[in-house]
């Protein structure tokens, strides 16, 4: 019986739901992975130093990214998810600007741009999903 309910759940998902979960999953994996690297990788520490940031900043940023992942994946209030999206946007735009400012190669400039594109898909589909949920709740 449980297998049937799982099948019904997947059958009820729309393309918008799939786009949301795939983009949010990718974004979350990227953020959790980068946070791990911020905590453990000497190369990342050197990169932050090259960008002119103090050593403690990468630890703070790693913690913030992990909190953002929790806010996106856990059943949290809407305002927390909105703040997580906003924080990630600030992080990606700042990373892009910092890499361009120090003359880093395109291989260092491109990842925040790709992450921002994935975030936009996640955010747009999140807003559409919540709007649809509110509309169906009002009809009921």
Identify the function of each model-found stretch:
Residues 2-140:
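Membrane-interface extramembranous regions
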């Amino acid at each position: 019986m449980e297998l049937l309910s799982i099948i019904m759940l997947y059958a009820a998902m729309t393309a918008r739901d799939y786009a949301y979960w795939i983009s949010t999953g990718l974004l979350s994996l990227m953020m959790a992975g980068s946070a791990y690297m911020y905590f453990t990788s000497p190369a990342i520490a050197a990169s932050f130093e090259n960008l002119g940031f103090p050593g403690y900043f990468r630890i703070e940023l790693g913690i913030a990214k992990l909190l953002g992942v929790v806010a996106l994946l856990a059943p949290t209030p809407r305002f927390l998810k909105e703040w997580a999206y906003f924080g990630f946007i600030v992080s990606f735009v700042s990373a892009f600007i910092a890499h361009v400012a120090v003359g880093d190669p395109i291989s260092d400039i491109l990842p925040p741009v790709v992450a921002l594109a994935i975030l936009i898909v996640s955010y747009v589909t999140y807003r559409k999903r919540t709007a649809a949920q509110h509309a169906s709740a009002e009809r009921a």
